UniProtKB/Swiss-Prot annotation:
Protein name as annotated: Protein ApaG
Domain ApaG: 2-126
Pfam families: DUF525
Originating organism: Pseudomonas syringae pv. tomato (strain ATCC BAA-871 / DC3000)
Superkingdom to which the source organism belongs: Bacteria
Amino acid sequence: MSDSRYKVDVSVVTRFLAEQSQPEQNRFAFAYTITVHNNGELPAKLLSRHWIITDGDGHVEEVRGEGVVGQQPLIKVGQSHTYSSGTVMTTQVGNMQGSYQMLAEDGKRFDAVIEPFRLAVPGSLH
């Protein structure tokens, strides 16, 4: 059973970056914009990120780091934090998923799950 005091939702919008990609060299660039929304009952600070990136061939890369794009935002109740970043893959299709480690105002650490989302070159999926 989840505790409603610690509820953070994550939404993602992705975009293929044709101008930064080199398909002939198996280089496919993607941008993603993420909104982290605090639906809990306490302000929470985003401490760190953990990404699992899987390309179309099944190769997996894990990325861990502090904050997001150099920030560790404090997200107040009912507020959100939006940022953009990107990744480069060697296949036209892949997916990302992971979590953010959050620190609530009362000192409790908890994970905000980032559900799997697809990265795909337009027209690459039938």
